Amino acid sequence: GQHGFENIGIAGHPEGSPDITQETINEFLLKKFELSQSQNLNLELVTQFFFDAGPFIKWCANLVQKNINLPVRVGFPGPASFKTLLNFGMMSGVGNSLNFLKKNSTKVTDLLTKTSNDEMLSQLADYSLEESPLKAFHCFPFGGFEKTCYWLNEIQSGEFTIENQKIKLHKKVF
Protein backbone atom coordinates (compact mmCIF):
# COMPACT_ATOMS: atom_id res chain seq x y z
CA GLY A 1 0.00 0.00 0.00
CA GLN A 2 0.80 3.65 0.08
CA HIS A 3 2.71 3.38 3.38
CA GLY A 4 4.50 0.11 2.61
CA PHE A 5 2.03 -2.22 4.30
CA GLU A 6 0.97 -5.19 2.20
CA ASN A 7 -1.04 -7.15 4.78
CA ILE A 8 -2.76 -6.28 8.02
CA GLY A 9 -3.34 -8.78 10.81
CA ILE A 10 -6.15 -8.24 13.28
CA ALA A 11 -6.97 -10.20 16.42
CA GLY A 12 -9.24 -13.19 16.05
CA HIS A 13 -10.91 -14.56 19.18
CA PRO A 14 -11.97 -18.21 18.69
CA GLU A 15 -12.53 -18.59 22.43
CA GLY A 16 -13.84 -15.09 23.06
CA SER A 17 -12.09 -12.61 25.31
CA PRO A 18 -12.39 -12.03 29.05
CA ASP A 19 -12.32 -8.25 28.44
CA ILE A 20 -14.80 -7.89 25.55
CA THR A 21 -18.31 -9.27 25.05
CA GLN A 22 -18.84 -11.69 22.18
CA GLU A 23 -21.41 -9.28 20.72
CA THR A 24 -18.82 -6.47 20.62
CA ILE A 25 -16.19 -8.77 19.12
CA ASN A 26 -18.60 -9.83 16.36
CA GLU A 27 -19.73 -6.25 15.68
CA PHE A 28 -16.20 -4.89 15.26
CA LEU A 29 -14.98 -7.88 13.29
CA LEU A 30 -17.77 -7.28 10.78
CA LYS A 31 -16.91 -3.54 10.62
CA LYS A 32 -13.22 -4.33 10.02
CA PHE A 33 -14.11 -6.87 7.34
CA GLU A 34 -16.42 -4.40 5.56
CA LEU A 35 -13.73 -1.70 5.73
CA SER A 36 -11.15 -4.08 4.27
CA GLN A 37 -13.49 -4.85 1.38
CA SER A 38 -14.32 -1.20 0.66
CA GLN A 39 -10.65 -0.14 0.85
CA ASN A 40 -9.26 -3.23 -0.91
CA LEU A 41 -7.05 -4.13 2.08
CA ASN A 42 -5.38 -7.50 2.58
CA LEU A 43 -6.66 -8.33 6.04
CA GLU A 44 -6.09 -11.56 7.96
CA LEU A 45 -7.24 -12.80 11.35
CA VAL A 46 -4.46 -13.78 13.75
CA THR A 47 -5.45 -15.86 16.78
CA GLN A 48 -4.14 -16.41 20.27
CA PHE A 49 -2.82 -19.88 21.07
CA PHE A 50 -5.16 -22.56 22.35
CA PHE A 51 -5.11 -26.27 23.24
CA ASP A 52 -8.38 -27.51 21.72
CA ALA A 53 -9.08 -27.36 17.98
CA GLY A 54 -12.85 -27.84 18.39
CA PRO A 55 -13.82 -24.26 19.34
CA PHE A 56 -11.45 -22.89 16.69
CA ILE A 57 -13.01 -25.00 13.93
CA LYS A 58 -16.50 -23.99 15.10
CA TRP A 59 -15.42 -20.33 15.11
CA CYS A 60 -14.10 -20.65 11.54
CA ALA A 61 -17.38 -22.24 10.44
CA ASN A 62 -19.19 -19.26 11.96
CA LEU A 63 -16.98 -16.87 9.95
CA VAL A 64 -17.80 -18.74 6.74
CA GLN A 65 -21.52 -18.75 7.60
CA LYS A 66 -21.43 -14.96 8.07
CA ASN A 67 -19.50 -14.52 4.78
CA ILE A 68 -16.52 -13.02 6.60
CA ASN A 69 -14.05 -14.28 4.05
CA LEU A 70 -10.73 -13.57 5.69
CA PRO A 71 -7.73 -15.87 5.91
CA VAL A 72 -6.91 -17.06 9.41
CA ARG A 73 -3.41 -17.42 10.89
CA VAL A 74 -3.77 -19.70 13.90
CA GLY A 75 -1.65 -19.40 17.04
CA PHE A 76 -0.06 -22.67 18.06
CA PRO A 77 1.91 -23.37 21.24
CA GLY A 78 5.35 -24.72 20.44
CA PRO A 79 6.88 -27.50 22.53
CA ALA A 80 7.03 -26.59 26.22
CA SER A 81 6.50 -28.18 29.60
CA PHE A 82 2.94 -28.55 30.81
CA LYS A 83 3.62 -26.13 33.66
CA THR A 84 4.85 -23.49 31.20
CA LEU A 85 1.84 -23.97 28.92
CA LEU A 86 -0.54 -23.79 31.89
CA ASN A 87 1.09 -20.60 33.19
CA PHE A 88 0.92 -18.87 29.80
CA GLY A 89 -2.64 -20.09 29.34
CA MET A 90 -3.72 -18.61 32.67
CA MET A 91 -1.98 -15.30 31.93
CA SER A 92 -3.51 -15.09 28.45
CA GLY A 93 -7.07 -16.02 29.37
CA VAL A 94 -7.45 -18.98 27.02
CA GLY A 95 -10.07 -20.27 29.44
CA ASN A 96 -11.99 -22.70 27.23
CA SER A 97 -8.78 -24.49 26.32
CA LEU A 98 -7.67 -24.66 29.95
CA ASN A 99 -11.06 -26.09 30.91
CA PHE A 100 -10.69 -28.62 28.10
CA LEU A 101 -7.31 -29.71 29.48
CA LYS A 102 -8.69 -30.04 32.99
CA LYS A 103 -11.59 -32.22 31.77
CA ASN A 104 -9.41 -34.40 29.53
CA SER A 105 -6.79 -35.85 31.82
CA THR A 106 -5.31 -38.00 29.05
CA LYS A 107 -4.51 -34.84 27.11
CA VAL A 108 -2.85 -33.45 30.23
CA THR A 109 -0.83 -36.66 30.58
CA ASP A 110 0.20 -36.40 26.92
CA LEU A 111 1.30 -32.81 27.43
CA LEU A 112 3.18 -33.75 30.58
CA THR A 113 5.11 -36.47 28.78
CA LYS A 114 5.66 -35.13 25.27
CA THR A 115 5.27 -31.37 25.69
CA SER A 116 3.63 -30.64 22.34
CA ASN A 117 0.03 -30.86 21.23
CA ASP A 118 0.43 -33.16 18.24
CA GLU A 119 -3.19 -34.27 18.07
CA MET A 120 -4.39 -30.70 17.76
CA LEU A 121 -1.78 -30.00 15.07
CA SER A 122 -3.04 -33.04 13.13
CA GLN A 123 -6.65 -31.84 13.48
CA LEU A 124 -5.70 -28.37 12.24
CA ALA A 125 -3.71 -29.83 9.33
CA ASP A 126 -6.72 -31.95 8.31
CA TYR A 127 -9.01 -28.96 8.65
CA SER A 128 -6.73 -26.76 6.52
CA LEU A 129 -7.12 -29.22 3.63
CA GLU A 130 -10.87 -28.56 3.56
CA GLU A 131 -12.54 -25.40 2.28
CA SER A 132 -11.56 -23.51 5.41
CA PRO A 133 -10.25 -20.04 6.16
CA LEU A 134 -7.19 -21.54 7.92
CA LYS A 135 -4.26 -20.51 5.75
CA ALA A 136 -1.23 -20.30 8.06
CA PHE A 137 -0.07 -20.66 11.61
CA HIS A 138 2.37 -18.95 13.90
CA CYS A 139 4.11 -20.41 16.93
CA PHE A 140 4.43 -19.21 20.47
CA PRO A 141 7.90 -20.45 21.57
CA PHE A 142 7.04 -20.85 25.26
CA GLY A 143 9.55 -23.68 25.70
CA GLY A 144 12.30 -21.63 24.11
CA PHE A 145 12.98 -20.27 20.67
CA GLU A 146 15.65 -22.86 19.83
CA LYS A 147 13.43 -25.85 20.71
CA THR A 148 10.53 -24.41 18.74
CA CYS A 149 12.73 -23.78 15.68
CA TYR A 150 14.13 -27.31 15.86
CA TRP A 151 10.62 -28.78 16.18
CA LEU A 152 9.36 -26.72 13.20
CA ASN A 153 12.38 -27.65 11.07
CA GLU A 154 11.88 -31.36 11.77
CA ILE A 155 8.24 -31.12 10.75
CA GLN A 156 8.98 -29.01 7.67
CA SER A 157 11.70 -31.42 6.50
CA GLY A 158 9.40 -34.42 6.91
CA GLU A 159 11.43 -35.95 9.74
CA PHE A 160 8.36 -37.35 11.50
CA THR A 161 5.72 -40.03 11.33
CA ILE A 162 2.07 -39.85 12.34
CA GLU A 163 0.68 -42.60 14.54
CA ASN A 164 -2.83 -42.38 16.05
CA GLN A 165 -3.06 -38.67 15.20
CA LYS A 166 0.20 -37.99 17.02
CA ILE A 167 3.31 -36.59 15.40
CA LYS A 168 6.44 -38.49 16.32
CA LEU A 169 9.68 -36.73 15.43
CA HIS A 170 12.47 -39.02 14.30
CA LYS A 171 14.76 -37.20 16.76
CA LYS A 172 13.87 -35.84 20.19
CA VAL A 173 13.34 -32.09 20.56
CA PHE A 174 14.98 -31.91 23.99
Feature map (PLM): residue ranges:
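Surface-exposed cleft-lining segments at the edges of enzyme active sites
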Residues: 14-18, 42-48
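Short, surface-exposed connector motifs at secondary-structure boundaries
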Residues: 37-45, 129-136
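Active-site pocket-lining/capping segments in soluble small-molecule metabolic enzymes
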Residues: 1-34, 64-129, 142-145, 155-174
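Short Gly/Thr/Asp-enriched flexible loops that form oxyanion-binding sites at enzyme active sites
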Residues: 59-60, 152-155
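Hydrophobic secondary-structure block in the mid-to-C-terminal portion of proteins
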Residues: 35-44, 54-57, 63-67
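Conserved strand-turn element in the central/C-terminal portion of the radical SAM core barrel
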Residues: 44-52, 74, 137
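C-terminal structured interaction module
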Residues: 136-142
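Active-site glycine- and acidic-residue-rich loops that bind
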Residues: 20, 47-62, 142-147
